[in-house]
């Protein structure tokens, strides 16, 4: 990459003050609304058990019903309200013209409840997959002029779509962490042990006693083993992220690729943040309640240091004269992301909690919505009295914004599951979830290749839209093929 274009590109993505809280929330709401739209259309026109929709055709239709509207919303933002209103009206009107009665509301309450309480939750799969899809789309789209500058990552203060995307990726990882699922895992293991003991008891009471003692001893040994090897397990599990972080760092330096230094620093990148956040959890093995409290204390202390001990001035103005100061943004913002992860484990525990009725799930969705509003009010108070929101520092305002917007999206996703009675994730969501890390890595590689093959910031609108849509389709298609072939891509 020649130096002149590199400087032009860096200037192109720099100096952004961001968008508004509501515009960001509005755009992100489009994904779950698109899922509702897709389900209603499928239930109306493709609800035939004798002639089920071919999987390949389903994938293509889902891409146009769910992914394409999001691409349109982030490139032509003025279309967003029309897309949302149009989809909602369609959901109300289209079933009226169906040849047979379409039952959308509570189609199968028992089955819906069973699957809402299962380990694999469709609404959570869709949330995580679409966070990743949105992230992959935006990391390329931001390099084109068709992508509004206000949606790109902010320079220092402000809030934007891409700012929220970064924190949402961290939060989505926390939601499905072992710590979040621990209570459900323990219940399943306990139930399995009880069933085994009952079976043994039927065979022989004596052997049952022996087996029970053996089982207890084995469990105790496994517990000791898990504690002693947790750190090594976490390091091994996060090794791919750390390796990718080093590979990205080396490549960007060696090929003179454009960098936004104020984002994470001179050497740090988002792969390091994700890896270190997960590894840190090995030292902080608490239950979800304590983790949430620790997360709150951590972000409050961090904000106090930013305001009262000159940490803000250090991050924004201190010269990059040693390894730590060269990467001050990445190192300091790590604290904010860790707080998001710790609080996220508590949210995940609530999501995985077994509920006895759909009414309880409706109450839970309402509780999430109210919590979202509370965090929004706290965010406003933080903006006025404490500090402006900053992704660069991952401060208190940033954490509150991440929690507010994501809890709002969770509540919508759960309500859509309750309304449609459809508990299965879409084909695209299921496919992306199988190989999330690989899709994210591939998205980064393709983004780099596209930036090297053309001067993206000078591309006309038509060419930009074709490239962004084709790139997204290629990622989704590969994810779909890997899932169809039952292939998991791992590097360890």
Swiss-Prot record:
Glycosylation site positions: 204, 289, 424
Membrane topology note: Multi-pass membrane protein
Pathway(s) it belongs to: Glycolipid biosynthesis; glycosylphosphatidylinositol-anchor biosynthesis
Intracellular or extracellular location(s): Endoplasmic reticulum membrane
Entry GO CC: endoplasmic reticulum membrane
Biased amino acid composition, Low complexity: 205-216
Broad class of enzyme this protein falls into: transferase
UniProt source species: Dictyostelium discoideum
Keywords on record: Acyltransferase, Endoplasmic reticulum, Glycoprotein, GPI-anchor biosynthesis, Membrane, Transferase, Transmembrane, Transmembrane helix
One GO term (biological process): GPI anchor biosynthetic process
Signal sequence bounds: none
GO MF entries: glucosaminyl-phosphatidylinositol O-acyltransferase activity
Family: Belongs to the PIGW family.
One Pfam entry name: GWT1
Transmembrane portions of the chain: 26-46, 59-79, 82-102, 127-147, 156-176, 264-284, 290-310, 331-351, 364-384, 399-419, 437-457, 464-484
Its job: Probable acetyltransferase, which acetylates the inositol ring of phosphatidylinositol during biosynthesis of GPI-anchor.
Protein name: Phosphatidylinositol-glycan biosynthesis class W protein
EC number, UniProt record: 2.3.-.-
Region Disordered: start-end pairs: 185-216
């Amino acid at each position: 990459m020649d130096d002149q274009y590199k400087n032009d590109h860096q200037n192109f993505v720099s100096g952004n003050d961001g968008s508004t809280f509501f515009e960001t929330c509005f755009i992100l709401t489009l994904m779950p609304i698109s899922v509702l739209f897709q389900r209603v259309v499928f239930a109306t026109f493709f609800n035939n058990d004798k002639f089920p929709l071919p999987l390949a055709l389903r994938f293509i239709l889902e891409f146009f019903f769910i992914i394409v509207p999001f691409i349109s919303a982030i490139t032509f933002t003025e279309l967003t309200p029309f897309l949302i209103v149009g989809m909602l009206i369609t959901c109300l009107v289209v079933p009226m013209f169906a040849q047979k009665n379409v039952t959308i509301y509570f189609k199968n309450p028992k089955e819906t409840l069973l699957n809402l309480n299962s380990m694999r939750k469709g609404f959570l799969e869709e949330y995580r997959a679409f966070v990743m899809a949105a992230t992959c789309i935006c990391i390329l789209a931001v390099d084109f002029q068709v992508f509004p500058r206000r949606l790109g990552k902010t320079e220092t203060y402000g809030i934007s779509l891409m700012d929220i995307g970064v924190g949402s990726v961290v939060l989505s990882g926390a939601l499905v962490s072992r710590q979040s699922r621990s209570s459900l895992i323990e219940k399943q293991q306990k139930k399995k042990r009880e069933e085994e003991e009952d079976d043994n008891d039927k065979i022989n009471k004596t052997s049952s006693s022996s087996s029970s003692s053996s089982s207890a001893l084995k469990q105790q040994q496994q517990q000791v083993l898990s504690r002693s090897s947790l750190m090594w397990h976490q390091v091994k599990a996060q090794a791919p992220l750390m390796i990718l972080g080093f590979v990205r760092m080396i490549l960007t330096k060696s090929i003179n690729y454009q960098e936004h230094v104020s984002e994470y620093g001179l050497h740090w990148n988002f792969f390091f943040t994700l890896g270190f956040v997960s590894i840190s959890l090995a030292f902080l093995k608490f239950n979800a309640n304590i983790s949430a409290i620790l997360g709150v204390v951590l972000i409050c202390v961090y904000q106090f240091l930013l305001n009262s001990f000159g940490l803000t001035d250090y991050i924004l103005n201190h010269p990059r004269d040693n390894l730590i100061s060269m990467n001050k943004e990445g190192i300091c913002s790590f604290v904010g992301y860790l707080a998001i992860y710790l609080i996220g484990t508590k949210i995940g525990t609530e999501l995985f909690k077994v509920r006895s009725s759909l009414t309880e799930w409706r109450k839970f969705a309402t509780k999430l919505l109210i919590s979202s509003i509370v965090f929004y009010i706290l965010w406003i108070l933080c903006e006025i009295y404490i500090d402006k929101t900053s992704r660069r520092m991952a401060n208190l305002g940033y954490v509150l914004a991440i929690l507010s917007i994501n809890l709002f999206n969770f509540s919508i996703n759960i309500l859509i599951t309750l309304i449609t009675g459809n508990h299965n994730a879409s084909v695209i969501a299921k496919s992306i979830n199988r190989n999330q890390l690989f899709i994210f890595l591939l998205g980064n590689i393709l983004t780099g290749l596209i930036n090297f093959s053309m001067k993206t910031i000078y591309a006309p609108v038509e060419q930009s839209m074709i490239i962004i849509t084709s790139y997204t389709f290629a990622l989704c298609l590969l994810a779909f093929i890997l899932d169809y072939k039952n292939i998991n891509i791992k590097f360890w």
